[in-house]
Amino acid sequence: MSNQIYSARYSGVDVYEFIHSTGSIMKRKKDDWVNATHILKAANFAKAKRTRILEKEVLKETHEKVQGGFGKYQGTWVPLNIAKQLAEKFSVYDQLKPLFDFTQTDGSASPPPAPKHHHASKVDRKKAIRSASTSAIMETKRNNKKAEENQFQSSKILGNPTAAPRKRGRPVGSTRGSRRKLGVNLQRSQSDMGFPRPAIPNSSISTTQLPSIRSTMGPQSPTLGILEEERHDSRQQQPQQNNSAQFKEIDLEDGLSSDVEPSQQLQQVFNQNTGFVPQQQSSLIQTQQTESMATSVSSSPSLPTSPGDFADSNPFEERFPGGGTSPIISMIPRYPVTSRPQTSDINDKVNKYLSKLVDYFISNEMKSNKSLPQVLLHPPPHSAPYIDAPIDPELHTAFHWACSMGNLPIAEALYEAGTSIRSTNSQGQTPLMRSSLFHNSYTRRTFPRIFQLLHETVFDIDSQSQTVIHHIVKRKSTTPSAVYYLDVVLSKIKDFSPQYRIELLLNTQDKNGDTALHIASKNGDVVFFNTLVKMGALTTISNKEGLTANEIMNQQYEQMMIQNGTNQHVNSSNTDLNIHVNTNNIETKNDVNSMVIMSPVSPSDYITYPSQIATNISRNIPNVVNSMKQMASIYNDLHEQHDNEIKSLQKTLKSISKTKIQVSLKTLEVLKESSKDENGEAQTNDDFEILSRLQEQNTKKLRKRLIRYKRLIKQKLEYRQTVLLNKLIEDETQATTNNTVEKDNNTLERLELAQELTMLQLQRKNKLSSLVKKFEDNAKIHKYRRIIREGTEMNIEEVDSSLDVILQTLIANNNKNKGAEQIITISNANSHA
């Protein structure tokens, strides 16, 4: 077995390496320490099991953990005796005995070096790959060159001496990296970019799915893949390039393998779609485009623009005069009418479906909310991009109509069919914008789901650079649907967008420089104004007129105050004026001109200042008033609580008095019994003396108790009032420190205020004393209760609740007595007569 032991050096350490079926087992030459991890590997333990064994049995002994360096040398090293014990325990001692027993005597030959284990480095792999790729490229170049020579010779034989050798590849300046970079940019929409609006040229919008190229070339054309991949790159070419542009050798890894050059007709279509116009053909193409635009009305039935005539179509420039930033334009073919494909089967199916959809939208079934035809819920498969064709003169798509109508089933069906959520009408408005302009999604309660489908377009802008927030705010907060839409948008946008993007959306300026906050200010809309400010809209942005939202709101407030002052004089004679009061504002509608006037709840709702802090303080005045009202309510509750406590104390005093009287009576009875002599005669003089003494003692005790109770009541009242006064002083102090108040150094005024404060304190003490006296002075009332108790045989506790009944009984008895007296008087008079 000694032939299995070798010499090796790992991480600068000389070791003996024993070759085992599970791997190498190492022992250090300098101290005969053995790698315990290798022993556990020889015992066929898994890594997790090895770790547990090392922790329980090895690490508590003498050991050395080696981490880093050569991988095979790493592990937990232990002395030879511990290694032998470990091997014996796990039944591998016999297998590793040659390594344990091996010793090298002085002068003896060292074991042979361990066999080399080849580990290919990264440099070697790169060199191998580079050499293989170079050889493959050179071989491909030689094959391509031979094929070109053969093709050139065949062209001469066929009688085409001018045919140039064809080269495979893309024009100079177009690389695979540039195409990839462009592809990334094309996938980014306006909603993925920050504001301001990026300048994306129309020629850079992807049109890789256009039916024109596919149907024109057909499946037999071998250059379709080249054109579709090179279309973006060729847009970077200069128009001055010749039609026979210079080509360079193509990289084999880009996947393009066609050696066929595009035909002249196909090259012309390609140049027209990509904007690559050679100098020799520029005038010809312009002439063809002019002729095609003149005959574009009936040239293609694939792009309908109205529900009545789906066969009508216009050139792209006429169909989308204003288009916004949404990339729906990329889904509509960008080519002149002459190069449009002929009608296909899928085109006809989509046109029929759109026709049925328009008929349903304008029918009474839609208005009456009848059951939806099932055929409308199943658009033709593979209908994109035909499904995004305009269906009315304003270039709305079917998806625009479905979202505007709030018809969620149709909207979801079109969404699943692949319709573009960023399709725009003639004003550049997206389906989300159109949905927010009507109340249908509000009445049907479908706007949250529609917004969920279209949430990616919430940052898109139309041709006027207005967002969906602009469109909602223009409808004013007096419209319930507008309030509902804004609440949904602002609440759900937080789920997928950071705060800075929300603020960018709210502060987006249109072509007039107006943000949504400017529009709310122009409308005098306090509700929307405050909502947008709370969400992060800035009040300091100036529009093109140089006005901020604050300034516009102040102007609206001034006009409102003037108009309200005029209306107070005219209101008595104006019978056509209807006033509708809302919870937050007053809406005044004039039946003559439908003029809407919003008057504020208070001036602080409208007044704004150049300082944002001053504006916030002004608007917090209602909060201060509400806090004072809450404080008054709390004080009132405490007052009622104190009254209840005082009443309970009075009841306690009454019960104590009653007990005192009963005890006194019992005491007198006992004293009378004990003061009788043997003959049963009472000693009256002694009785009176004893009774008087007892009464004096009881009176003194009761007075002391009364004084103590009075003191307790007064202390409680003073303590509660002190707490309230301290709280009021603290609130006033905080309010004084928060608001910058000029210091008044007028000593005389301070003295007057101090004198007034002293008077108020004295008044408070006097009122407190009078309040305690009122509770104390109940002797007469108690006597009245005792009189009633003696006359009615009722308990004193029941007297207060029975006063009304007793009074009515006495009145009734009095009336009966008077009637009896009158009867007696009459009978006496008759008897005398």
Curated annotation (Swiss-Prot):
Query: Domain of life here?
Result: Eukaryota
Task: Give an example GO biological process.
Answer: maintenance of translational fidelity
Where is the sequence biased in composition, kind Low complexity?
Answer: 280-307
What does the UniProt entry say about where the protein is found? Nucleus
Which sequence positions fall in the DNA-binding region?
36-57
GO molecular function of the protein, one example?
A: sequence-specific DNA binding
Composition skew (Basic and acidic residues), residue ranges: 139-149
> Which residues are modified to Phosphothreonine?
325
Q: How does it assemble?
A: Component of the transcription complex MCB-binding factor (MBF) composed of SWI6 and MBP1. Interacts with MSA1.
Q: What does this protein do?
A: Binds to MCB elements (Mlu I cell cycle box) found in the promoter of most DNA synthesis genes. Transcriptional activation by MBF has an important role in the transition from G1 to S phase. It may have a dual role in that it behaves as an activator of transcription at the G1-S boundary and as a repressor during other stages of the cell cycle.
According to UniProt, the name of this protein is Transcription factor MBP1
Gene symbol of the encoding locus: MBP1
